[in-house]
Amino acid sequence: MRPVSVWQWSPWGLLLCLLCSSCLGSPSPSTGPEKKAGSQGLRFRLAGFPRKPYEGRVEIQRAGEWGTICDDDFTLQAAHILCRELGFTEATGWTHSAKYGPGTGRIWLDNLSCSGTEQSVTECASRGWGNSDCTHDEDAGVICKDQRLPGFSDSNVIEVEHHLQVEEVRIRPAVGWGRRPLPVTEGLVEVRLPDGWSQVCDKGWSAHNSHVVCGMLGFPSEKRVNAAFYRLLAQRQQHSFGLHGVACVGTEAHLSLCSLEFYRANDTARCPGGGPAVVSCVPGPVYAASSGQKKQQQSKPQGEARVRLKGGAHPGEGRVEVLKASTWGTVCDRKWDLHAASVVCRELGFGSAREALSGARMGQGMGAIHLSEVRCSGQELSLWKCPHKNITAEDCSHSQDAGVRCNLPYTGAETRIRLSGGRSQHEGRVEVQIGGPGPLRWGLICGDDWGTLEAMVACRQLGLGYANHGLQETWYWDSGNITEVVMSGVRCTGTELSLDQCAHHGTHITCKRTGTRFTAGVICSETASDLLLHSALVQETAYIEDRPLHMLYCAAEENCLASSARSANWPYGHRRLLRFSSQIHNLGRADFRPKAGRHSWVWHECHGHYHSMDIFTHYDILTPNGTKVAEGHKASFCLEDTECQEDVSKRYECANFGEQGITVGCWDLYRHDIDCQWIDITDVKPGNYILQVVINPNFEVAESDFTNNAMKCNCKYDGHRIWVHNCHIGDAFSEEANRRFERYPGQTSNQII
């Protein structure tokens, strides 16, 4: 039975409610029945998994029937009221989209609106009891402060046994504890109960049970174990059993969802004739090498669609994108649940899903939305095998992009890195633990060439989210007792799981600037921006202009022309310019702000405003083999919110020395007709080329994803006209489609597939 905790209104609460009702007058006819029912004894409980005793899905019993609350319009104020109904002092947070699993039965309340001062949930506005257009995929939950209300009566808790739940699962190696490489893939199953760790009786244990346990531990699949060996070993050891009768279907994301039984305190004969349950898990490709197992070559069927995660700070989390007709697209969050999320996680080589995310929690995608209303049983090998609805334009928007957080194997990587000297746990000087001859020791990292990509890996290894800044100097932070530099020349691609996977100098430490003043530091953040260029607009607005030199003095002053313009016969003649508009969207979860402070912004007389970034975008003309033949020379940029999505307000503007940046949900538009919004192609010969635009090319400002910062188009130039087509974000196509793009022979069709 699932763990629940139940409280009922105390007689004093009932008396207080009646007194308040007499003071305030009779309730209106439309809300009267609900308040009356509440005053006569609503019951509340927390349910779901995995959870602690002070958090969970909120369930209310009314007229003898249990039901849930929809998350529409749910706020922290409503959570405060519900936590007090449950006997806690206040709420510290709330959850949506059935984070603790979907409930059953009625959905009692929808559009619940509380001010936070109400004495009861019945005093909050809502659509009325039982009036809802939600599904249980939208069940709300609360996270209460672990502090009880003084004098609150909790004598109506159902039974003590119902508080029992499997809080955590681990594998304990039967032999060689502490000597095996991480992650541990085989051993005895142990579950953490309120009174400590216990083993599980293996009577009736099945492969389905192992599948669920391995999924919780971050492994996509399981394999058979040497039962005879473990049976012999069990006879020589003492055991502490706390759980038996486990019967999983195999699709559960958590052991708490399986049918299981807890031993009672007075049970003396535990697991008669049985032994401790044992599992052997198969790690995914990312973790196979570190666990000492060889990577298994998993052959995919011909034509099988692929899946990827984008925008996540950690491995195994992100926005779900699937490949259809050689183009990547997102998944609508309608009907999105843990079963579908677990299929994605296992397909990618991780365990089951820890969380099914909705509402573009991992940022919005751009382009196609391929799937909607995905309904998986949990047994499918690919998301495309699940029943789903063909998407139409009016069905979904990118504000509903689905995401996942997967269970990952424990590797201990976070124990080999730490921060010191910072003002908070999210910032500080980076210290790493290294081995070698002698004992393990902590040391610093040389700040030379340390940047955003290296900081991304450090923050990921620390478990602190995204990188906000990578710092080459840390003299302004408190100095610690660690002074030795043990790592230098660190160069990361940004995708590594830990710093020791990045290229570095090894044991030969080379640091140009010595001393702890110039060691590497980071500032991490839970959110980050994500910039994308609207590629279709580039294709629609591209054209050639022969602009007279006497109109280009300001552009020449800002170095926006090719070098050959210096020897031109000014003010006579002209320059041939490829002009286009660029619309840069921030689809992340944090505003994009320039790295430089206001004190260092540069005034540009030609434009009449300050520029906050020297290098924000590169414009290039490339040959098919990647050789650059022309480039845009825009000296610097001003960042502002030109337009925003509905219900998003502009925050940044260039005029009047305003704050600069791009708000989440807004975009900065550089129109084709402004100075320097071009590439000087005067010296380019006729032929087939690639137009490339790269945003934030030097990674000066941190983002959640840099792989979508480049846009490419095919160009055919005949010396008089130019055709620009096939414009797309750099990672929007499959690898095969991108290879065909690079081999572009010069056709004028807009289709490359």
Curated annotation (Swiss-Prot):
Pfam family, one: SRCR
UniProt PTM comment: The lysine tyrosylquinone cross-link (LTQ) is generated by condensation of the epsilon-amino group of a lysine with a topaquinone produced by oxidation of tyrosine.
Effect of mutating residue 459 to A: Impaired ability to mediate deacetylation of STAT3
Cofactor: Cu cation; lysine tyrosylquinone residue
Compartments it resides in: Secreted, Extracellular space; Cytoplasm; Nucleus
SMART domains: SR
Gene3D superfamilies: SRCR-like domain (3.10.250.10)
Location of region: Disordered: 290-315
Keywords: Copper, Cytoplasm, Deafness, Disulfide bond, Glycoprotein, Inflammatory response, LTQ, Metal-binding, Nucleus, Oxidoreductase, Repeat, Secreted, Signal, Stickler syndrome, TPQ
Effect the entry attributes to changing residue 446 to A: Impaired ability to mediate deacetylation of STAT3
GO biological process: collagen fibril organization; epithelial to mesenchymal transition; fibronectin fibril organization; inflammatory response; lung development; negative regulation of DNA-templated transcription; negative regulation of T-helper 17 cell lineage commitment; peptidyl-lysine oxidation
Crosslink site: Lysine tyrosylquinone (Lys-Tyr): 634-670
Ranges of Low complexity composition bias in the record: 290-302
Biological role: Protein-lysine 6-oxidase that mediates the oxidation of peptidyl lysine residues to allysine in target proteins. Catalyzes the post-translational oxidative deamination of peptidyl lysine residues in precursors of elastin and different types of collagens, a prerequisite in the formation of cross-links between collagens and elastin. Required for somite boundary formation by catalyzing oxidation of fibronectin (FN1), enhancing integrin signaling in myofibers and their adhesion to the myotendinous junction (MTJ).
Similarity comment text for this entry: Belongs to the lysyl oxidase family.
Quaternary assembly: Interacts with STAT3.
Disease in which the protein is involved: Defects in LOXL3 are found in a family with an autosomal recessive form of Stickler syndrome, an inherited disorder that associates ocular signs with more or less complete forms of Pierre Robin sequence and sensorineural deafness. Pierre Robin sequence includes an opening in the roof of the mouth (a cleft palate). The degree of hearing loss varies among affected individuals and may become more severe over time. Syndrome expressivity is variable. Ocular disorders include non-progressive myopia with associated chorioretinal degeneration.
Protein name: Lysyl oxidase homolog 3
Native source organism of the sequence: Homo sapiens (Human)
Name of the coding gene: LOXL3
